[in-house]
Regions:
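Short acidic-hydrophobic surface loop/beta-edge motif
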Residues: 16-25
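Extended acidic low-complexity intrinsically disordered regions
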Residues: 1-15
Length: 135
């Protein structure tokens, strides 16, 4: 068995990994969870728009990154639950993405998105990657 396989076999399966995130303007922290690649793919697929080029007769799919980020935040946020109908009704909206837009200021959304990206392993900084590549 190679070293990577040994390492993987020794690791515990991480389930329900969560982290608390302090968001300015809210007295209590938000709780976000990690998602799986399968969940992420499913969310990404719902955010794709397929276009057909008549000249080349080719189909291409483009992902709406803003919609993907909103849906990823909604899926990963345990508390508050953006899918809660009562909370949506209080803000006068329908849907988790609409609630996020109504409830959070742009800076608050970015802070929450960064926490979601970090817990899901998207935290690699380009400067860090560049430094690693140089060495």
């Amino acid at each position: 068995m190679d070293k990577l396989m040994e390492f993987l076999m020794e690791q515990e399966v991480r389930e329900n990994e969560t982290v608390e995130v302090d968001i300015a303007g809210f007295p209590y922290p938000f709780v976000v969870r990690a998602t799986t690649e399968a969940e992420s793919k499913s969310i990404r697929k719902t955010c794709q728009k397929v276009t057909f080029d008549k000249k080349s007769r080719q189909r291409s799919a483009e992902t709406d990154s803003d919609l993907y980020n909103s849906r990823l935040v909604a899926a990963c946020c345990v508390s508050p639950n953006f899918k809660d109908a009562q909370l949506q009704a209080k803000y006068g909206v329908v849907g988790a993405e609409a609630l996020i837009d109504a409830m959070l200021k742009p800076g608050q959304f970015i802070d929450l998105l960064l926490a979601v990206q970090e817990i899901n392993g998207f935290s690699s900084d380009m400067d860090e990657l560049r430094d690693e590549a140089k060495n």
